[in-house]
Amino acid sequence: MSYNHSYQSHASTHRAIPQYNPMAAMTAPAGTFLPGTKVQVGSHRVVVEKYLSEGGFAHVYVVRLPHPVDGNETAVLKRVAVPDKAALANMRTEVETMKKLKGHRHIVKYIDSHASQLRGGGYEVFLLMEFCSGGGLIDFMNTRLQNRLTEPEILKIFSDVAEGVACMHYLKPPLLHRDLKVENVLISRYGGASYYKLCDFGSTAPPRPAATSAAEGRLIEDDVQRHTTLQYRSPEMIDVYRKQPIDEKSDIWALGVLLYKLCYYTTPFEEVGQMAILNASYKFPSYPQFSDRLKMLVGR
């Protein structure tokens, strides 16, 4: 494991140089690694197989491992351009959280990581993790716009995600994910079965007691703005001055929003704003139809 607090210069640690290829540039942003590029990530020297996606400051690749990990020869490499130390701290949070949760079947598996300081300023982080062959849950949902998810499918997805969250909450001290949403769930497929796994742990944090002053409230408010998604925020995140802690209940609230989204492909507060969140005021659409038991689970 080479993700640590002593960052070396970019000149000595960057072991892969992307080559320019006009054909590759049609499908991938400029500066991405080409297939065949070798990258050293900690103790793993991986070979890029294909460019997968882009998000924020990150490029994501499917790579071939030098030796199988848990029987898998492929993995995912997340290459992140980190502009400053605050963003670097978020990446460190993600890496350290994945290490703590390693081995849980509903958490994307951490393999290795590496960070280096760039000569021109900023940092570059490589994060190597398991390849989830089923892709993202949000992409799967988009293939089912006409034929919506069934109640058994929804309960399976929700159960898997809730298990992953419970694993975080049972740590000592507990950790909150703080950014639970369908976009942060990936799908693994083994032997014809699907397993749903939590990813993106850059927002994780321990529970936080209620603010005791206006200054502390402003700090918490800023932290919430930067690390959470509005539609999934709990009332105590919307109004940090109501003197309630931000704890495991905040994640449980977000799980309810996620369950509603699985059912109706929208969040319960999409159109009605923050007052509706504060008052827990929402309605169930008439279509699709679900059992009263499932609706009660949303409300819990």
Residue ranges of each PLM-predicted region?
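Juxta-kinase regulatory segment immediately upstream of eukaryotic protein kinase catalytic domains
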Residues: 1-41, 49
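Catalytic-loop of the protein kinase fold
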Residues: 169-189
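Conserved short submotifs of the Hanks-type protein kinase catalytic core
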Residues: 120-136
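Protein kinase glycine-rich loop
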Residues: 49-56, 60
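Short beta-strand micro-motifs within the conserved protein kinase catalytic domain, predominantly
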Residues: 109-123
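Activation segment/activation loop of eukaryotic-type protein kinase catalytic domains
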Residues: 183-228
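Glycine-rich ATP phosphate-binding loop
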Residues: 59-82
